[in-house]
């Protein structure tokens, strides 16, 4: 039977260098909180539970965890999420001590950092294999500039780090000697340790160090003293253990994350004009032969069908775009809670806006400066320029003229407009809801329609044209 995994996530830090009132672990990377990435990673390990240790902004952190965006199909729904508070913050060892009452001795405790979002589940599985329920396993990395990191001190010499030699200690940078500071192998902040051993070692910690803190890393010397093997799983991918302590570091890690998203999509066959000018802030699923131009942002849950083409500078959130659709440049699609559906072969934009609840059928055309909100457009309907469709049901092959709008709001409530199949709406019309335009009807340009119109009828509602011959324009009066 596999040893149960209990994950402890360090999320108590203030993040002073972020210069923000928002707790550091709630700052976003790829459209999701740093902490959300870590929790999802824990879930993909099939962990029994995750204990989030909160401190600074604890109430905000705990509340946010209930609303963190889930990746499609992830296992987080099966992860038991619990909380412990570290008040005051007296070091990493003190932090883990707050979680101990929630941990059972039959498991392995995996310690992660809430501000280290790019660690991969495969890396942690390898670390857990090294632990094997009986060893203290550390995730380490060789760094050209290890300043600020705890150094891995191995048997034999303190100035070198041979991967084959026994780990003897972790020395924090501020407590390290000059010789120890010459070591380039660093501790990532991630470890796996049998909980029954961790419990005893935590209670032996003291704060006799430069920072007067209880270091979790001191358990290494206790393990050595007790004859417990201390092993290191060394990786080469620095981004997997990179933490966020400032807006600069957050921006740097964002670009790493986005490039990895872009690379994964291109390996699936997606054609990106420039992977350096592409952002995914949620999840993006693409069919075969999808093309995406530069400076596009995808947020929430977005699905692109086969052969979809996305023009430059588009923002698309929470939308499903069917095969063969073309989204021209500068289009904004935001499905929010209701979602947006774009049918096969539809043409959208440029400069179009699709708002929540827009449901567009096959071969629908939505042109420049057209806004659609909470409306259904059937196959072949067209609104090619300068128009608004809100709370409307539009039939097949409708042509909706430039400058026309549905007046859907009476100051208190929204009302629906129904435009039946094969209707032609002239330019600059106002359809005052609730109203129905009968099948095959025509509304003359400039009309304000307030009553239902019968099928096949021409409906015109506008003031009579008056022309005054020999009209003299007013002359501007000279002042002084």
UniProtKB/Swiss-Prot annotation:
InterPro entries assigned: Bifunctional_GlmU, GlmU-like, GlmU_C_LbH, Hexapep, MobA-like_NTP_Trfase, Nucleotide-diphossugar_trans, Trimer_LpxA-like_sf
Family: In the N-terminal section; belongs to the N-acetylglucosamine-1-phosphate uridyltransferase family. In the C-terminal section; belongs to the transferase hexapeptide repeat family.
Biological pathway: Nucleotide-sugar biosynthesis; UDP-N-acetyl-alpha-D-glucosamine biosynthesis; N-acetyl-alpha-D-glucosamine 1-phosphate from alpha-D-glucosamine 6-phosphate (route II): step 2/2; Nucleotide-sugar biosynthesis; UDP-N-acetyl-alpha-D-glucosamine biosynthesis; UDP-N-acetyl-alpha-D-glucosamine from N-acetyl-alpha-D-glucosamine 1-phosphate: step 1/1; Bacterial outer membrane biogenesis; LPS lipid A biosynthesis
Subunit composition and interactions: Homotrimer.
Subcellular locations according to the entry: Cytoplasm
Domain of life, source organism: Bacteria
Name of the gene: glmU
Region (Pyrophosphorylase): 1-247
CDD domains listed in its UniProt record: GT2_GlmU_N_bac (cd02540), LbH_GlmU_C (cd03353)
Keyword Acyltransferase listed: yes
Cofactor(s) listed: Mg(2+)
Species this chain originates from: Polaromonas sp. (strain JS666 / ATCC BAA-500)
Amino-acid positions noted as binding acetyl-CoA in the UniProt annotation, renumbered to this chain: 402, 408-409, 427, 445, 462
Name under which the protein is recorded: Bifunctional protein GlmU
Lipoprotein recorded as keyword: no
Gene Ontology terms: cellular component: cytoplasm; membrane
Job description of the protein: Catalyzes the last two sequential reactions in the de novo biosynthetic pathway for UDP-N-acetylglucosamine (UDP-GlcNAc). The C-terminal domain catalyzes the transfer of acetyl group from acetyl coenzyme A to glucosamine-1-phosphate (GlcN-1-P) to produce N-acetylglucosamine-1-phosphate (GlcNAc-1-P), which is converted into UDP-GlcNAc by the transfer of uridine 5-monophosphate (from uridine 5-triphosphate), a reaction catalyzed by the N-terminal domain.
């Amino acid at each position: 039977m596999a040893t149960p995994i209990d994950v402890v996530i360090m999320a108590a830090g203030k993040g002073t260098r972020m210069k923000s009132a928002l707790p550091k672990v709630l700052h976003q990377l790829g459209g999701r909180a740093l902490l959300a990435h870590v929790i999802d990673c824990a879930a993909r390990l099939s962990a029994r539970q995750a204990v989030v240790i909160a401190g600074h902004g604890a109430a905000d952190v705990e509340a946010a965890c209930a609303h963190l965006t889930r990746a499609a199909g992830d296992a987080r729904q099966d992860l038991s999420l619990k909380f412990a508070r570290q008040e005051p913050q007296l070091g990493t060892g003190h932090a883990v001590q707050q979680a101990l009452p929630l941990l059972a001795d039959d498991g392995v405790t995996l310690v992660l950092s809430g501000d280290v979002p790019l660690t991969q589940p495969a890396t942690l599985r390898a670390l857990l294999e090294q632990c094997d329920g009986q060893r203290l396993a550390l995730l380490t990395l060789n760094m050209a500039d290890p300043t600020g990191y705890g150094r891995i001190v191995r048997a034999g010499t303190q100035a070198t780090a041979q991967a084959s030699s026994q780990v003897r200690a972790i020395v924090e940078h501020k407590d390290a000697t000059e010789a120890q500071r010459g070591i380039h192998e660093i501790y990532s902040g991630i470890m796996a340790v049998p909980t029954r051993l961790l419990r005893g070692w935590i209670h032996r910690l003291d704060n006799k160090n430069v920072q007067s803190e209880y270091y979790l890393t001191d358990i290494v010397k206790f393990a050595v003293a007790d004859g417990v093997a201390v092993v290191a799983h060394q990786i080469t991918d620095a981004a997997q253990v990179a933490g966020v302590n400032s807006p600069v570091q957050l921006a740097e890690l964002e670009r790493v994350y986005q490039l990895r998203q872009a690379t994964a999509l291109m390996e699936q066959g997606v054609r990106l004009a420039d992977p350096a000018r592409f952002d995914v802030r949620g999840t993006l699923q693409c069919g075969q032969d999808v093309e995406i131009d530069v400076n596009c942002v995808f947020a929430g849950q977005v699905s692109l069908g086969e052969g979809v083409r996305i023009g430059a500078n588009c923002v698309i959130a929470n939308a499903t775009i069917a095969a063969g659709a073309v989204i021209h440049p500068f289009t904004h699609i935001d499905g929010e809670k209701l979602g947006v559906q774009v049918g096969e072969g539809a043409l959208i934009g440029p400069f179009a806006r699709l708002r929540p609840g827009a449901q567009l059928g096959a071969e629908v055309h939505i042109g420049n400066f057209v806004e659609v909100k909470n409306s259904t457009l059937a196959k072949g309907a067209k609104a090619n320029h300068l128009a608004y469709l809100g709370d409307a049901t539009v039939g097949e092959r409708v042509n909706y003229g430039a400058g026309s709008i549905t007046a859907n709001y009476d100051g208190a409530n929204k009302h629906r407009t129904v435009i039946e199949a094969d209707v032609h709406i002239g330019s600059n019309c106002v359809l005052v809801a609730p109203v129905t335009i009968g099948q095959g009807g025509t509304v003359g340009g400039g009309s304000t329609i307030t009553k239902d119109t019968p099928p096949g009828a021409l409906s015109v509602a506008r003031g009579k044209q008056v022309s005054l011959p020999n009209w003299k324009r007013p002359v501007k009066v000279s002042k002084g």
